Every structure is written in C-alpha cells, then in structure tokens.
Design a protein with these regions (language model features):
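Hydrophobic alpha-helical transmembrane segments of multi-pass membrane transport proteins
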Residues: 53-57, 61, 112-129, 191-202, ...
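Helix-helix packing/entry segments at the starts of transmembrane helices
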Residues: 139-143, 210-220, 259-294
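Glycine-/small-residue-enriched transmembrane alpha-helix faces in small-molecule transporters
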Residues: 16, 31-72, 173-205, 291, ...
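Membrane-interface interhelical linkers
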Residues: 7, 22-50, 83-111, 162, ...
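C-terminal transmembrane-helix exit sites in multi-pass transporters
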Residues: 127, 144-164, 286-305
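C-terminal-most transmembrane helix of multi-pass membrane proteins
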Residues: 180-181, 185, 282-340
C-alpha cells in the first residue's frame, strides 16, 4: 500500500510531493483574498480523496492477482513500479533531481534503507489482504500516526504534550485488548505501522521528491525481485504467462496502481492545508476496515470491536489535539507578524 502511507503517506510526507514542475513546491497557504484559492483547494481536496480512496480500495485489487503468491506479487510490483516511476521521472522532467540523489551518498543510503523497509511493508500488506486479514491491515494504518509520534519520541527525542501521551496510552491499551482477542500479537498491524513509520522517518530525513525517491527505492530492490522471478520461471512455478493474458496484464498493472495515487497525493499536497491532509489519511484505513467487515465478512467479535473503538478514541484525541495546536501556532504567528 502504500500504503502508501503511503501513512497512505502521513502529513509529514507532504513536502515529498510529486507532479509537474510547478506542483512540486512545498504546500502553499492561500490568503482568503486570493481569487484562485477556493477552486484550487477544492481540486486539491478531490485529488486527496482520490489518492486515499484508491489506497483503501486497493484492498479488493490484490486478491485479483492470485494464484500468484504474495512474494511473486511483491516482486512484480517492485519491477513494474521501477519501470513506471522511471518513465514518470522523464515525463515530469525530474531527471536532474534523480541525478542529484545518485550523486549524494548520504541521500542514496537513506533511500536504500527506505527501499528495504517499504519492501517489508508491501509484502506484509499483500500477505494480510490475500490471507483474509484485511481488518488487521486496517488497524496498522489506523495506528500509524500514533506510532510515528512514538518513534519521534524514542528516536528524535521529541517531547509530547499531555493529550498526545493520553492518546498513546489508550492506543497501547487497545493493542493489549486486541492481543487477547486474537490470541496473539496483531503482528501484521504492528509490522505495517512500524515499517511505515520508519519509512516516513527515512524519507523525511532524505527530504527529496516522492517520485524520484520511489524510482530509486524500487531500483535498489529490483535485482532481488528479478532474481526471484527468474527462479520462479526456472522452476516452473511462475504464474506470469501461464495463467492467461488477463492475469499477466494484472501483474503488469501493479506499476500503474502504485503510481496513480502517488501522483494524486503529490498534486493534492500543493493545494490543501496540512490539517486537511492529516484528516484525509484516515480515509484509507476506514475503507479497508469497511471492506473487511461488510464486504469480505471477516469476523468481528465484541472484544475486537472494543479494541478498535479504543483505537478510534485515541485517534480522535490525537487529531483534535494536533488540530488545536496547529491553530494556536498559526494565531501566534499572525500576532507576532502584526506586532513586528
């Protein structure tokens, strides 16, 4: 998935946007008097909803790739995403930025690390969705913002405000409840949340555009993907070319499936406020959860509902506190500017 994030991507990934050269700036704040602000923000909202909506709806896409196994699907996604991203880098004229990444050893190593982490994330997500654990995968993306904050405390030494601590404690209680319910740790959710949190941290540190970044990341792991696919062909275990043209085209389409929501997100990030993107990020796990429960009929005993309700309470507290804090900071900035 992306989860993309693909916290889909978290609000912290906003500056890693993609698009045309004019769309790759940092998110803009439109003054109320600006005549094009409202249409631009509406367009951005539509693009943001499209991005997160697609990430959520792809829950129904990955099972279509069976009888290919999760690792074969992953290998094809890496390969076709690399080719798709390479083409888009040329189309959007990002080759200069790509060369700069390759010339900077530190940035390249950060993206190489990100490549390994997102590979784990993609593999876990595909495995979960194709093994009737869609609800558990949605949990991973619900708790991802909280895990990202926790990693900020543990790795970056950031300080939390009281309500942020409260949200983390409630979310921790939810994990305990769900562990008892499942009879095991909800490992799929935890791997998804922590892998995407780590991915976001590495990308934030690298601070490069998402399009050329993903082109580099998929190129780093492409040799492993190609080697695995070659082994499948050599052993007669490959589904590509043996399950019909439709199946082969679906595997090829994994590159487009990866690219389209990423482009929508990048275009949205330049048009809507951070707070709006922060709220939109919950659309993907909400759709995943709804599809898992109401379409795919996954079991939801009472204890599991309790665990998820606790997660949602934690997210309400976390989001409300973050929104209020952002507004206070804006007011302070306005007052400081007026005083100057």
């Amino acid at each position: 998935m992306i989860p993309f994030g693909l916290n889909g991507p978290s609000a912290r990934a906003v500056t890693l946007s993609v698009g045309t050269p004019d769309e790759t700036r940092r998110p803009r704040v439109y003054p109320r008097a600006y005549p094009g602000a409202v249409p631009e923000q509406r367009r951005g909202l539509l693009l943001g909803v499209s991005a997160y909506g697609l990430w959520g709806a792809f829950t129904l896409y990955w099972p279509l790739l069976e009888p290919a196994g999760p690792i074969e699907i992953l290998a094809h996604r890496i390969l076709w995403s690399m080719l798709t991203m390479g083409l888009l880098v040329v189309v959007f004229r990002r080759t200069t930025q790509l060369r700069a990444i390759l010339a900077d050893r530190r940035t390249f190593l950060l993206l190489a690390g990100a490549a390994l982490v997102i590979t784990v994330n993609w593999a876990t997500y595909i495995y979960g969705v194709n093994n009737e654990r869609v609800v558990e995968t949605s949990l991973g993306y619900f708790i991802n913002p909280l895990v990202t904050v926790l990693m900020g405390v543990l790795i970056l030494g950031e300080r939390l405000r009281p309500l942020q601590w409260a949200a983390l404690l409630i979310a921790s209680l939810a994990v305990v409840v769900l562990t008892v319910d499942y009879g095991r740790l909800p490992w799929i959710a935890l791997v998804l949340a922590f892998s995407f949190g780590t991915y976001g941290l590495l990308k934030k540190t690298a601070d490069v555009g998402a399009l050329e970044s993903l082109a580099v990341e998929t190129t780093v792991v492409a040799p492993l993907a190609l080697a695995y696919l070659a082994w499948l062909v050599a052993t007669g275990a490959s589904s590509f070319g043996t399950e019909g043209t439709g199946h082969a085209l679906l595997l090829v389409s994994t590159g487009i499936v990866t690219a389209v929501p990423l482009i929508c997100f990048g275009a949205a990030a330049t048009r809507v406020p951070l707070t709006t993107l922060g709220l939109l990020q919950y659309l993907a796990p909400v759709l995943q959860f709804a599809l898992g429960v109401f379409v795919l009929d996954e079991a939801m005993p009472a204890s599991r509902w309790i665990g998820f309700v606790l997660v949602w309470v934690a997210l309400v507290i976390f989001t409300a506190e973050a929104t209020n804090h952002h507004r206070r900071q804006l007011r302070l900035t306005v007052h400081a500017s007026a005083a100057a």
